[in-house]
Amino acid sequence: DHTALDLIIKSLKSPTMVCEGTHFDGKIPHTFVIFGASGDLAKKKIYPKLWWFYRDDLLPKLTKFCGYARSMLTVDSIKEQCLPYMKVQSHEQKKYEEFWALNEYVSGRYDGRTGFELLNQQLELMENKNKANRIFYLALPPSVFEEVTVNIKQICMSVCGWNRVIIEKPFGRDDASSQALSDHLAALFHEDQLYRIDHYLGKEMVQNLMTIRFGNKILSSTWNRENIASVLITFKEPFGTQGRGGYFDEFGIIRDVMQNHLLQILSLVAMEKPVSCHPDDIRDEKVKVLKSIETLTLKDMVLGQYLGNPQGTTDDARTGYVEDPTVSDDSNTPTYALGVLKINNERWQGVPFILRCGKRLNERKAEVRIQYQDVPGDIFEGNTKRNELVIRVQPGEALYFKMMTKSPGITFDIEETELDLTYEHRYKDSYLPDAYERLILDVFCGSQMHFVRSDQLREAWRIFTPILHQIEREHIRPITYQYGSRGPKEADRMCEENNFKYSGSYKWHGGKAATSNL
C-alpha cells in the first residue's frame, strides 16, 4: 500500500542516502516553527505549502505547526489572512479545519529571551514532551537574524530530536557581511542543520539540468568550448517593485537576482560531473566552478533603470522607478543588469556566460540558452543559423533544441525548427510542485542538494563584491530604458560582442510561452 508520502520520498533521495544522513522520520513528532508568521512570505507561500502537504498526506503524521511574530495575532487571524492563497476546495473543508487545529501562535519580541521561552514552552506542550524534530523557518528581515538564531540555539532547540534552520536570502550585502553571517551561524549550528533557501534551486527545469547534462551522451560530449559559442541565462519580469521599492532600492537587481538565482543556475550548467548524486558531491563541484570564475568588472556589465512609458494605458505603466514613492528621487539603483562572466578552466576557457536580469521588461521569462558554434564549411550560402539548446524555467517549463532542416516542398530551402519537449504537452497529467514545495519537503527529508552551502556563498560574493562596491562608491548612473521594452540597447550590443548571435527571425511555437523576443 504505497502512500503519496512513499512516492515523494523515493523522488527526493536515493536508497543509499538513508545511511548517508538523509532521513524521513515518519513516526516521530515534527514541529514546524514559522518566524515572521505575520508577514507576506508566510501567508502567501509558507502556510499554503504546509496546508497542501497536509492535504496530500506528504508530511510525517505527527507534524504540528507554530507561528511566531511580534504582532498580537491569533491562529484564527492568520487563517483569515492566508485564505486567499490556500486554494481550498469545498470537499476539503473538513481536512482544512483539521490542519488549522494543529496550529498554534506565540507573540513575542525577537531581541529578548522572554518570547522565546514562551515559544519553547508552547512547543513542549504541543510535543507532549516526547522526542521531536524541529524545523525553524526564518521568514524574517536580515536585521534580526543574529538575535533570533542565538535565541533559537539557547532556548528552543529540541533536546532529543534533530533541529534544522531554514534561512531566506539575502545572505549579506557583500563578502564581508555574508562572511560575518556565516561565521555567526557556524558558531551556533552545524552546516548540516542549515538550509539556506534559494527558491530557484527548487524549480523543475533547474533541477532537471543535471539530468539533461549528465544523462545524455549527445549533450555531454558537446558541452565544452569546442562546440559552445556562448551561454545566455535570462531572468525577465514585466512588473516593477510592487510595494518592495524600499527593500529593492537598498539591494538592487544584482543582489536580488544575479548574484544568487542566476549564478546558481550557471554553476549547474558549467560544473563538472559529480562523483555521485549525494548533495555534498554536487555542491563540491559547484564550488569548484565558482572558484574558476574571474571577478566581474564594469567593462563587462550594462546597468539599466526603467522609465515610465508616457503612452502607457495605466498609471503603473507610466510610472518610472524613481517615481515610486518608496524610492529616492536620485536613486542610482539598477533595475536591469547584464554581466559577462568568464570561467578560467579547460572546459570553458573563452566561452562567455552572459547573465541578464531586469524588471519592467517586455515579458516574464527565465531560461538558459546554450548557443552552439557556427557550422564550419557552410555550404548553404550563409542561410544557416546557430543551433541552440533552450531550457525554459518559467513560464511553461520546456526544453527545446533549435536546428536547421529542409523546408517541406519542392524547393531546397532551409529553415529553423525545433525538437520540442514542452512539459504542458508531454506531461499533461503530471503535477509539477512549485519551488517552495520541493524545498520544504527536502528539509523534512534532510536533503541539502538544492540548498546553498557557506563556501558557495563565499565564492559568489567574491565574484560580485568589487563591482557592487564600485557602483556605490562612484555613484554610477544606470542607462535608462522604457517600461515594456527589452532593456537597454547597449545590452544587445554587449551580447553581440560576446559571441551571442540574435537574428530575431525565429519564433518558438512550444506552448503558451511562445515568443520571438529574447
UniProtKB/Swiss-Prot annotation:
<comment type="function">
    <text>Cytosolic glucose-6-phosphate dehydrogenase that catalyzes the first and rate-limiting step of the oxidative branch within the pentose phosphate pathway/shunt, an alternative route to glycolysis for the dissimilation of carbohydrates and a major source of reducing power and metabolic intermediates for fatty acid and nucleic acid biosynthetic processes.</text>
</comment>
<feature type="binding site">
    <location>
        <position position="369"/>
    </location>
    <ligand>
        <name>NADP(+) 2</name>
    </ligand>
</feature>
<dbReference type="GO" id="GO:0006739">
    <property type="term" value="P:NADP metabolic process"/>
</dbReference>
<feature type="binding site">
    <location>
        <begin position="420"/>
        <end position="422"/>
    </location>
    <ligand>
        <name>NADP(+) 2</name>
    </ligand>
</feature>
<feature type="binding site">
    <location>
        <begin position="400"/>
        <end position="402"/>
    </location>
    <ligand>
        <name>NADP(+) 2</name>
    </ligand>
</feature>
<feature type="binding site">
    <location>
        <position position="169"/>
    </location>
    <ligand>
        <name>NADP(+) 1</name>
    </ligand>
</feature>
<feature type="binding site">
    <location>
        <position position="169"/>
    </location>
    <ligand>
        <name>D-glucose 6-phosphate</name>
    </ligand>
</feature>
<feature type="binding site">
    <location>
        <position position="256"/>
    </location>
    <ligand>
        <name>D-glucose 6-phosphate</name>
    </ligand>
</feature>
<dbReference type="GO" id="GO:0050661">
    <property type="term" value="F:NADP binding"/>
</dbReference>
<protein>
    <recommendedName>
        <fullName>Glucose-6-phosphate 1-dehydrogenase</fullName>
        <ecNumber>1.1.1.49</ecNumber>
    </recommendedName>
</protein>
<feature type="binding site">
    <location>
        <position position="365"/>
    </location>
    <ligand>
        <name>NADP(+) 2</name>
    </ligand>
</feature>
<dbReference type="GO" id="GO:0051156">
    <property type="term" value="P:glucose 6-phosphate metabolic process"/>
</dbReference>
<feature type="binding site">
    <location>
        <position position="394"/>
    </location>
    <ligand>
        <name>D-glucose 6-phosphate</name>
    </ligand>
</feature>
<feature type="binding site">
    <location>
        <begin position="36"/>
        <end position="43"/>
    </location>
    <ligand>
        <name>NADP(+) 1</name>
    </ligand>
</feature>
<dbReference type="GO" id="GO:0009051">
    <property type="term" value="P:pentose-phosphate shunt, oxidative branch"/>
</dbReference>
<feature type="binding site">
    <location>
        <begin position="199"/>
        <end position="203"/>
    </location>
    <ligand>
        <name>D-glucose 6-phosphate</name>
    </ligand>
</feature>
<feature type="binding site">
    <location>
        <position position="237"/>
    </location>
    <ligand>
        <name>D-glucose 6-phosphate</name>
    </ligand>
</feature>
<keyword id="KW-0560">Oxidoreductase</keyword>
<dbReference type="InterPro" id="IPR022674">
    <property type="entry name" value="G6P_DH_NAD-bd"/>
</dbReference>
<dbReference type="InterPro" id="IPR022675">
    <property type="entry name" value="G6P_DH_C"/>
</dbReference>
<dbReference type="GO" id="GO:0006006">
    <property type="term" value="P:glucose metabolic process"/>
</dbReference>
<keyword id="KW-0963">Cytoplasm</keyword>
<feature type="active site" description="Proton acceptor">
    <location>
        <position position="261"/>
    </location>
</feature>
<feature type="binding site">
    <location>
        <position position="502"/>
    </location>
    <ligand>
        <name>NADP(+) 2</name>
    </ligand>
</feature>
<dbReference type="Pfam" id="PF02781">
    <property type="entry name" value="G6PD_C"/>
</dbReference>
<feature type="binding site">
    <location>
        <position position="364"/>
    </location>
    <ligand>
        <name>D-glucose 6-phosphate</name>
    </ligand>
</feature>
<keyword id="KW-0313">Glucose metabolism</keyword>
<dbReference type="GO" id="GO:0005829">
    <property type="term" value="C:cytosol"/>
</dbReference>
<dbReference type="InterPro" id="IPR001282">
    <property type="entry name" value="G6P_DH"/>
</dbReference>
<dbReference type="Pfam" id="PF00479">
    <property type="entry name" value="G6PD_N"/>
</dbReference>
<feature type="binding site">
    <location>
        <position position="508"/>
    </location>
    <ligand>
        <name>NADP(+) 2</name>
    </ligand>
</feature>
<dbReference type="InterPro" id="IPR019796">
    <property type="entry name" value="G6P_DH_AS"/>
</dbReference>
<keyword id="KW-0119">Carbohydrate metabolism</keyword>
<feature type="binding site">
    <location>
        <position position="356"/>
    </location>
    <ligand>
        <name>NADP(+) 2</name>
    </ligand>
</feature>
<comment type="similarity">
    <text>Belongs to the glucose-6-phosphate dehydrogenase family.</text>
</comment>
<keyword id="KW-0521">NADP</keyword>
<feature type="binding site">
    <location>
        <position position="486"/>
    </location>
    <ligand>
        <name>NADP(+) 2</name>
    </ligand>
</feature>
<dbReference type="GO" id="GO:0004345">
    <property type="term" value="F:glucose-6-phosphate dehydrogenase activity"/>
</dbReference>
<feature type="binding site">
    <location>
        <position position="70"/>
    </location>
    <ligand>
        <name>NADP(+) 1</name>
    </ligand>
</feature>
<feature type="binding site">
    <location>
        <position position="359"/>
    </location>
    <ligand>
        <name>D-glucose 6-phosphate</name>
    </ligand>
</feature>
<feature type="binding site">
    <location>
        <position position="392"/>
    </location>
    <ligand>
        <name>NADP(+) 2</name>
    </ligand>
</feature>
<dbReference type="InterPro" id="IPR036291">
    <property type="entry name" value="NAD(P)-bd_dom_sf"/>
</dbReference>
